Curated annotation (Swiss-Prot):
<feature type="region of interest" description="Disordered">
    <location>
        <begin position="1"/>
        <end position="118"/>
    </location>
</feature>
<dbReference type="GO" id="GO:1903724">
    <property type="term" value="P:positive regulation of centriole elongation"/>
</dbReference>
<dbReference type="GO" id="GO:0005814">
    <property type="term" value="C:centriole"/>
</dbReference>
<dbReference type="Pfam" id="PF15503">
    <property type="entry name" value="PPP1R35_C"/>
</dbReference>
<dbReference type="GO" id="GO:0005813">
    <property type="term" value="C:centrosome"/>
</dbReference>
<dbReference type="InterPro" id="IPR033590">
    <property type="entry name" value="PPP1R35"/>
</dbReference>
<dbReference type="GO" id="GO:0005737">
    <property type="term" value="C:cytoplasm"/>
</dbReference>
<keyword id="KW-0206">Cytoskeleton</keyword>
<feature type="compositionally biased region" description="Pro residues">
    <location>
        <begin position="86"/>
        <end position="97"/>
    </location>
</feature>
<comment type="function">
    <text>During centriole duplication, plays a role in the centriole elongation by promoting the recruitment of the microtubule-binding elongation machinery through its interaction with RTTN, leading to the centriole to centrosome conversion. In addition may play a role in the primary cilia assembly.</text>
</comment>
<keyword id="KW-0650">Protein phosphatase inhibitor</keyword>
<protein>
    <recommendedName>
        <fullName>Protein phosphatase 1 regulatory subunit 35</fullName>
    </recommendedName>
</protein>
<dbReference type="GO" id="GO:0045724">
    <property type="term" value="P:positive regulation of cilium assembly"/>
</dbReference>
<feature type="compositionally biased region" description="Basic residues">
    <location>
        <begin position="62"/>
        <end position="79"/>
    </location>
</feature>
<comment type="similarity">
    <text>Belongs to the PPP1R35 family.</text>
</comment>
<keyword id="KW-0963">Cytoplasm</keyword>
<dbReference type="GO" id="GO:0004864">
    <property type="term" value="F:protein phosphatase inhibitor activity"/>
</dbReference>
Length: 266
C-alpha cells in the first residue's frame, strides 16, 4: 500500500484530489538486538510527520476538503509492524511455584487405586473412637451420641411428639368401659363363615323338566267308524300246523331295549 504526503496532492475541478506517485517509504533499519521479521509478517507503515491540523495556509476550502478525505483514507489503511520476540529457550529447572493456598491441588483420579468403602470407613471411625476413649468404651454415651446423630430416629421422635400434641383431649379419654365377655354367637357365626368359605363350590341341580303335553288328535283327519282292517286267512290243506319256537337273544339286547325306551321317552 502506498502512502502519499500532502505536498504530492494536487487540486483539480470541484476540489477533488489526485494522487501523484512518489518515492516509496524506506523501511526502518533493524535494531542490532532485534530479530529480523519474517516476510509474511512484515506489516510496515511509514510514520506521517504531518498532523491533521497542519497544512498550507493559502489552500482553498475545496482543496482542503479533498486533502482531509485523502488523509482519512490513508489513516484507515495504515499498517502496523509487529516485532517478534526471540524464542525463549526451554527451561529445564524446577516447575513454577504452586498457586495460592486457596487453590487445592486435584487428587489423581486413578481407577486402579482402592478407596475406602462404607464398611472400611465405619471401622476406621470405630477405631478412632476407641483410641480417643483410651481403651475405656462408654456404651451409654456412644448410644446417646448415635441417637442424637441419627436422622431417622429424630424424625420418628418428632412424629410421635407431634401426634401426641395435635390429638385433642376428648379423643384420648375413655368414653365407656370395655366389656370382657366373649359373645359366643358372634364367634360361632364367624367360625362358620370361615369354614364355609374353605369348602369348594357345590354344583347346582338342574331345574326340573316340564312334562310333555298331549299330542295332536289324529281322529280329526278321518272318521274312526269308517275305518276297516282286513287280516288274511290263509289255509293250506295237507300242511301241518305251524309250531311256535323261541329264538334266543343275546343278553345285551336287554340294555339296548332299555336305552331305546329312554330315548323314546325323551
Amino acid at each position: 500500500m502506498m502512502v502519499y504526503n500532502g505536498s504530492q496532492l494536487e487540486s483539480v475541478e470541484e476540489g477533488e484530489a489526485v494522487a501523484v506517485p512518489g518515492p516509496p517509504p524506506e523501511p526502518r533499519a533493524p535494531e542490532p538486538g532485534a530479530p529480523v521479521p519474517e516476510p509474511g509478517l512484515d506489516l510496515s507503515l511509514s510514520p506521517r510527520s504531518e498532523s491533521p491540523g497542519r497544512g498550507r495556509p493559502n489552500c482553498s476550502p475545496g482543496r482542503r476538503k479533498g486533502r482531509a478525505d485523502r488523509r482519512g483514507g490513508a489513516r484507515k489503511g495504515r499498517q502496523v509492524r509487529f516485532l517478534l520476540a526471540p524464542p525463549s529457550p526451554v527451561r529445564s529447572g524446577p516447575p513454577p511455584a504452586a498457586a495460592s493456598s486457596s487453590e487445592k491441588p486435584e487428587a489423581p483420579q486413578d481407577l486402579g487405586t482402592p478407596v475406602q468403602q462404607s464398611s472400611l470407613a465405619l471401622s476406621l471411625e470405630l477405631q478412632a473412637a476407641r483410641a480417643a476413649a483410651g481403651g475405656q468404651f462408654d456404651a451409654a454415651k456412644a448410644v446417646e451420641e448415635q441417637l442424637r446423630k441419627s436422622f431417622q430416629t429424630r424424625c420418628g421422635l418428632e412424629e410421635s411428639v407431634t401426634e401426641g400434641l395435635n390429638v385433642p383431649r376428648s379423643k384420648r379419654l375413655f368414653r365407656d368401659l370395655v366389656s370382657l365377655q366373649v359373645p359366643e354367637e358372634q364367634v360361632l357365626n364367624a367360625a362358620l363363615r370361615e369354614k364355609l368359605a374353605l369348602l369348594p363350590p357345590q354344583a347346582r341341580a338342574p331345574p326340573p323338566k316340564e312334562p310333555p303335553g298331549p299330542g295332536p288328535d289324529m281322529t280329526i283327519l278321518c272318521d274312526p267308524e269308517t275305518l276297516f282292517y282286513e287280516s288274511p286267512h290263509l289255509t293250506l290243506e295237507g300242511l301241518p300246523p305251524l309250531r311256535l319256537q323261541l329264538r334266543p337273544r343275546p343278553s345285551e339286547d336287554t340294555f339296548l331295549m332299555h336305552r331305546t325306551l329312554r330315548r323314546w321317552e325323551a
